[in-house]
Amino acid sequence: MPTKTITITLEAYERLKREKREGESFSDVIIRLTEKRRDLLEFAGKWKDSGEEIEKIILEGRKEFDKHVLS
């Protein structure tokens, strides 16, 4: 697989290092963090669930997001 060398600041390196999981390369980290995330509005009007069920789904999604971002 071809590679490319890049220069990043020490701060950027430290942040990337904090995101790195066991057994993961820095390339893996960059790919994982830059994967396209779907916008919730993309799903607007497509759910047939009740408002309460949708609210529950959104809250669970936020908890999952916080768990990954704040840990």
UniProtKB/Swiss-Prot annotation:
Family annotation (InterPro entries): Put_antitoxin (IPR003847)
Superkingdom in the source lineage: Archaea
Keywords: Toxin-antitoxin system
Pfam family, one: VAPB_antitox
This protein's record includes keyword Nucleus: no
Family: Belongs to the UPF0330 family.
Purpose: Possibly the antitoxin component of a type II toxin-antitoxin (TA) system. Its cognate toxin is VapC15 (Potential).
Protein name: Putative antitoxin VapB15
Lineage, uppermost ranks: Archaea, Methanobacteriati, Methanobacteriota, Archaeoglobi, Archaeoglobales
Gene (name only): vapB15
